[in-house]
Amino acid sequence: MSVYPPIEGSEVFIARRRRLMAALGELPVALFAGDPSPRNYAANVHPYRAHSHFLYLTGTAWPGAVLLGEGDEWEIFATPPAPDDALWLGASATWDTLAAAIGVQAIRPLAELADAIVAHGGAAALATLPAIHPRSRAQQAALFARPWGLHDESLHGAVPLSEPDSALAEAMISVRLSHDAAALAHIRGAIQITHRGHLAGMALTSPGRRECEVRAAIEREFTAHGAVPAYGSIVSVAGEILHNEHSHQHMRAGDLLLVDAGAELHGWASDVTRTWPVSGKFSPTQRAMYDIVLQANIDAIDQVRPGVRYRDVHLQACRTLTRGLVDEGILRGDIDNLVERGAHALFFPHGVGHLLGLDVHDMEDLGDRAGYGPGRVRSQQFGLGYLRLDRDLAVDMVVTIEPGFYLVPAILQDPSLCGPFDRDGTLQRERLAAFADVRGIRIEDDVRCTSGAPEVLSAEIPKAAQAVMDCVSA
């Protein structure tokens, strides 16, 4: 593919590399951009997306490239263009142009990388991070003698790291947790495009149409404004399936449509969820539950302030949701006791959100090392154990806030989860049955932590019940 200079000026990437070095010390670093992923044979590839750590420090999507350096001295190693690349792929910027735009001293052929590694003290002295793409991971294994297999990631922990790679991971996390002005500008731009997409999806929704028509309307806005989906869009009347990959069903009057769709602009992600009635009007039970989830969203957002532990933000959403379920007669008991026991997780089984940045779940390739602060580990309790983030919030961190209510058969029919609450009368199934038309509701915003009140970056995307209904029925 053709390689183009970054949107930002070189000073952005020079400053980021300096911050990384200040956090790391004078260790040499090598980061891989990664290779395209084939769909079904080598020449037919998915759209290329560079590894986020490389993208953060260079702003450039360059297949197969490697960034190598320390201090203020950095080089990129890449495969020279083939003679016929311009014919098939179009002309790329010259290497001199790219070097100046990225702020590196030189761009050299990839064949010279091995000698450059020796010049930096050898593979053992270099710090690197595991590549995501299999070909790049194989290169790392050969060049750096790292014991990283292709399938050794755990659900939460990613690849185990030793020094000096562990030090690089901690340094990278420290500089990427809070966003600079350039990053925030791109996130805002992505959210503006997401706003257009959600409005287009709402406007197209009506009984008889298919979910995929709404998805197409949303993603058309992404494409029309120079963005791509940041992840696989979820557009489904089966809102109880948390990460539903299918959008083939016809929508019917009485359905709720859950839409979790965000644009990615210049590599930076947005992540927004709205839920709306297909007919343009909530039923009484749908409206009651929608307002409970909305209040949980609002209350949790208000907690996004410097120094607040994100786990406490999650628990605030849980308390608000539980209070609403008690008010509706679905649960019985003391609010705090119910939350401590995890009764709310029967209906809200995931965490309230995650970091947002270049990755929609930012830095999740580094596992809980990124998401959890020092000394913090995941809970073993159902629901709370799925919390992706447990750090103290700081200025210019961007997080999602996404409480929900779901009627998941696999949970509600599981005696190991529901049994204790059934036996002591906490769970009132007869009352719950009245809410059968509420399969799933999620309301998700992207929120910046500031020195004062939280900034809801996605505030323009309608979420009040009447505003949502007005957009669907317009």
Predicted regions and their residues:
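Active-site neighborhoods and metal-handling regions in enzymes and metal-associated proteins
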Residues: 1-474
